[in-house]
Swiss-Prot record:
Species of provenance: Dehalococcoides mccartyi (strain ATCC BAA-2266 / KCTC 15142 / 195)
Name of this chain's protein: 6,7-dimethyl-8-ribityllumazine synthase
Recorded GO CC terms: cytosol; riboflavin synthase complex
Function (record text): Catalyzes the formation of 6,7-dimethyl-8-ribityllumazine by condensation of 5-amino-6-(D-ribitylamino)uracil with 3,4-dihydroxy-2-butanone 4-phosphate. This is the penultimate step in the biosynthesis of riboflavin.
Coiled-coil parts of chain: none
Gene3D superfamilies: Lumazine/riboflavin synthase
UniProt GO BP: riboflavin biosynthetic process
Binding site for 5-amino-6-(D-ribitylamino)uracil: F23, A57, F58, E59, A81, V82, I83, F114
Lineage: Bacteria, Bacillati, Chloroflexota, Dehalococcoidia, Dehalococcoidales
Length: 155
């Protein structure tokens, strides 16, 4: 039988960067708090956690790429909130942000985790930032720890 690989939820020694959108900060600040909570609970030192603020979600992939390619981090967590309005802007931004974040991870061979809420309403975004639907920032940080450790196990 062949080998089976998995990542563990132990963040000791991991260095993590977070890229956070300032737009919709009343949501993204809750995502950031959730992410920091997960990192701390799983043993990532606050000294090994860096945060880069960007103006909006569209700028997340560029900054994530710079951090991912720096060689200083085991994972990059991308946090933002894109809320549908009355124009097609939502579709353009959410599509390009998700594609950009995925490309950064593939290009850098590093876990670059998508923690961007795409919601039809402010209420939906609030639900996903720590109320009814959990906190997507917490979830993204937990995923980052697991995948960073999996990547280390894969060599």
């Amino acid at each position: 039988m062949g080998k089976e690989f998995s990542g563990v939820l132990n963040g000791q020694g991991l260095k993590v960067a977070l890229v956070v959108s300032r737009f919709n900060e009343f949501i993204t600040s809750k995502l950031l708090s959730g992410a920091k909570d997960s990192l701390e609970r799983h043993g990532v030192s606050a000294d090994n956690t860096d945060v880069a603020w960007v103006p909006g979600a569209f700028e997340i992939p560029l900054v994530a790429q710079k951090l991912a390619k720096s060689g200083r981090y085991d994972a990059v967590i991308c946090l933002g909130a894109v809320i549908r309005g009355s124009t097609p802007h939502f579709e353009y931004v959410s599509s390009e942000v998700s594609k950009g974040i995925a490309r950064v991870g593939l290009d850098a061979s590093l876990p670059v985790i998508f923690g961007v809420i795409t919601a039809d309403s402010i209420e939906q975004a609030i639900e996903r930032a720590g109320t009814k639907m959990g906190n997507k920032g917490f979830d993204a940080a937990t995923q980052a720890i697991e995948v960073a450790n999996l990547m280390k196990n894969l060599g």
